[in-house]
Every structure is written in structure tokens, then in C-alpha cells.
């Protein structure tokens, strides 16, 4: 059995951290064994922020719906349309009873936490509480200032959010 090293050198399975009871953040799924873990955890929807790999074909056999929302981890301002797609997908998913959303990128450090922040902000969470909750639950998160600013610029134009 191939073992994957998690952060800090610890051996780990799927890199997934629940930041709320229905929203998880983590690293890449990459192969079927990890997709099986994701589906077994009750995840019904995946927002894949990594440009490196599209999870759609891996997810199909397990009935998991995927939004491939790829973006480079380039520390540049992210367009509102990117955040809008993810927020729309997540909120529609969360409207379904029993659904759970996994938001991931390659390592779960920058892009996925940015998208999770956008989702929580769109749900009405205050910025400080959303940042703190994500960072406390997933200690490898590194909120790049430019990504937080991208989310806040998006939220300014998002109807009814962040209030």
C-alpha cells in the first residue's frame, strides 16, 4: 500500500479537514483511493480549485458532483467570476438536505481556504470569524493578503452577503 505523507511528515490518508459540519477544506484527491475516502466521509459535492487536475472523472462512479474551478496559486488578485462560480455551487449544494462540500486545491493551503472563505462570507459570516474558524480547524492554512482582498472585493458586490 502506498502511503502519503501529510504535513509535518506524518503519514496520512486523504488530506481533508472539516471547518464546519458540512464544509471541508483540503489537498488534492489525485486518485481513486482518496475519492473513496471522500465519498465515504459523506461528501456529495467537490469544488476543485486546482489547475493541476480535474476530479470529475474520479468522482462520477461515486455520485459526487464536481465543480472544476481551476486557478493558479500565483498570489495575484482572483476574479470575482471565479469566486462567484464556487459560491453559487456551494450554496446550491448546501441547500440540499444532507449534502457536504469538500473544497480543495493541491495542498489545501491557499486556494481552497480562499474559496472556503468566500463561501462562509457569502453565507453571512463576519470576516474575522470566518478567517479564524478556517485557520483554527486547519492549521496549515496561509491566507495570502491578496486572496483575502479578492474575497472581500467579491463580497462587496455579492448581494446580501457579508452583512
Predicted ranges, named:
Residues 1-101, 107, 115-163:
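Cys-dependent protein tyrosine phosphatase-like superfamily
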Amino acid at each position: 500500500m502506498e502511503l502519503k505523507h501529510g504535513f509535518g511528515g506524518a503519514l496520512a490518508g486523504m488530506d481533508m479537514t472539516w471547518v464546519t459540519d458540512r464544509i471541508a477544506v483540503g489537498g488534492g484527491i489525485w486518485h481513486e483511493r482518496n475519492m473513496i475516502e471522500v465519498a465515504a466521509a459523506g461528501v456529495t459535492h467537490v469544488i476543485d480549485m486546482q489547475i493541476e487536475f480535474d476530479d470529475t472523472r474520479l468522482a462520477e462512479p461515486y455520485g459526487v458532483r464536481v465543480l472544476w474551478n481551476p486557478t493558479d496559486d500565483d498570489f495575484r488578485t482572483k476574479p470575482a467570476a471565479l469566486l462567484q462560480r464556487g459560491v453559487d455551487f456551494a450554496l446550491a449544494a448546501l441547500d440540499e438536505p444532507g449534502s457536504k462540500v469538500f473544497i480543495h486545491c493541491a495542498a489545501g493551503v491557499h486556494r481552497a481556504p480562499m474559496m472556503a472563505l468566500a463561501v462562509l462570507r457569502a453565507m453571512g459570516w463576519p470576516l474575522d470569524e470566518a478567517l479564524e474558524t478556517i485557520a483554527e480547524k486547519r492549521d496549515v492554512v496561509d491566507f495570502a493578503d491578496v486572496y483575502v482582498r479578492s474575497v472581500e472585493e467579491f463580497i462587496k458586490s455579492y448581494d446580501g452577503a457579508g452583512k
